[in-house]
Amino acid sequence: MQSLTILGSTGSIGKATLSVIQQHTDKFFVHALVAKNNVAIMTEQCIAMSPKYACMISEDAARILKKNLITAGKYDIEVLSGVMHACELASTNDVDMVMSAIVGIAGLKPTFSALRAGKKILLANKETLVTGGKLFMKEANRYRACILPIDSEHNAIFQNLPEICQKSLGNTSLSECGISRIVLTASGGIFFKTPQKQLTKITPEQACVHPNWSMGRKISVDSATMMNKGLEYIEARHLFNAKPSEIEILLHPQSIVHAMVYYSDGNVLAHLAPPDMRIPIAYAMAYPKRIGLKISSNIDIYYLNKLHFDQLDNCSYPCFQLAIDADNCSQSATIILNAANEIAVEAFLRKMISFTDIPDVIRRVLDAINLNDPNDIEDILYIDQKAREKAISICVI
């Protein structure tokens, strides 16, 4: 049996991971659950899964969790708190694989801890690659960590890669593997056909609905602005060592075809699956083998003639274009982009700014800050903090 630490267990990816584990209790068990401050869900998960450790980033949340577990009779679960303990649980010798699903820059340190311990990392945290992709892929090679992407698009590309590319992720050029380009699909978000003039009136409640996927509030807004796809573009650049000319983004509202790989010999491999995150999670957990999975629906071959594809108009999605521009600029620019976006989205969710203000805030922060590329995690966090401070000052004016 293989043991897991789940970073971000109370979020949508964490819940989906636990769902896969519950279908395969003969193959996997939970060593530790880690979350920020959602005590209610963490309590339920601890009672259901009986991990050896439960860690809350918030000390106050950890105290409440401990009381809840004592009340529930779960005396054998050790409750910890803080980022340091999260890092320890991600790197301990008692763990075979780590699900990195903490949303935002908060997932950076625990994920790097797992990396430096040579773990099998199921990478769902976009920000690790967006903010530290160069450093992360370099150290993945150094510590021989196995990186398996969880985002449906990157997971789909990974499945369509030749074994040599899978085994040397980020180090082998696509052209050397006979690949001419990779294609990521994008649903276009909930406001795909909404006239531009109406976007200023969009509410957080409207933006937090995704047409195909079940996701958290922040990621749902990122999907609506298409920043999510911009971040995925940056991820793909690092994960697959791809040049800008080797990546294409294609609008596909149904989210059935997740990615395509074009080979130089004329072959095109497309990956199709229902929009259910348990599918890429199960693939990554079992890799290089495969395991069965009970899902509510499967692909109906007769439905395929109803699928739609279209070119992406970057002008309609300013957040996406900002991500492309930042990636073309520098690693520090993508750190600033990510930090400014997190603050802008939070401000929108709190109704401090409008939906269409989000790209304006990001653009102003990018224009205001110019720092050297990071050499280590502390540099990343410094640049991130400076960008957040600037974004906050803009949002509260």
UniProtKB/Swiss-Prot annotation:
UniProt-listed GO biological process terms: isopentenyl diphosphate biosynthetic process, methylerythritol 4-phosphate pathway involved in terpenoid biosynthetic process
EC number(s) stated in the UniProt entry for this protein: 1.1.1.267
Reaction equation(s) it catalyzes: 2-C-methyl-D-erythritol 4-phosphate + NADP(+) = 1-deoxy-D-xylulose 5-phosphate + NADPH + H(+)
Keyword NADP attached: yes
Residues that coordinate or bind Mn(2+): D151, E153, E232
Keyword Transmembrane helix recorded: no
Pathway(s) per entry: Isoprenoid biosynthesis; isopentenyl diphosphate biosynthesis via DXP pathway; isopentenyl diphosphate from 1-deoxy-D-xylulose 5-phosphate: step 1/6
Entry keyword set: Isoprene biosynthesis, Manganese, Metal-binding, NADP, Oxidoreductase
Enzyme class: oxidoreductase
InterPro entries registered for this protein in UniProt: DXP_reductoisomerase, DXP_reductoisomerase_C, DXP_reductoisomerase_N, DXPR_C, DXPR_C_sf, NAD(P)-bd_dom_sf
GO molecular function: 1-deoxy-D-xylulose-5-phosphate reductoisomerase activity; manganese ion binding; NADPH binding
A Pfam short name: DXP_reductoisom
The protein's required cofactors: Mg(2+); Mn(2+)
UniProt xrefs under Gene3D superfamilies: 1.10.1740.10, NAD(P)-binding Rossmann-like Domain (3.40.50.720)
Sites where the protein binds 1-deoxy-D-xylulose 5-phosphate: K126, S152, E153, S187, H210, S223, N228, K229, E232
Binding-site positions, NADPH: T10, G11, S12, I13, N38, N125, E127, G216
UniProt record similarity statement: Belongs to the DXR family.
Subunit structure: Homodimer.
Biological role: Catalyzes the NADPH-dependent rearrangement and reduction of 1-deoxy-D-xylulose-5-phosphate (DXP) to 2-C-methyl-D-erythritol 4-phosphate (MEP).
HAMAP family: DXP_reductoisom
Designated name of the protein: 1-deoxy-D-xylulose 5-phosphate reductoisomerase
Lineage: Bacteria, Pseudomonadati, Pseudomonadota, Gammaproteobacteria, Enterobacterales
Gene name for this UniProt entry: dxr
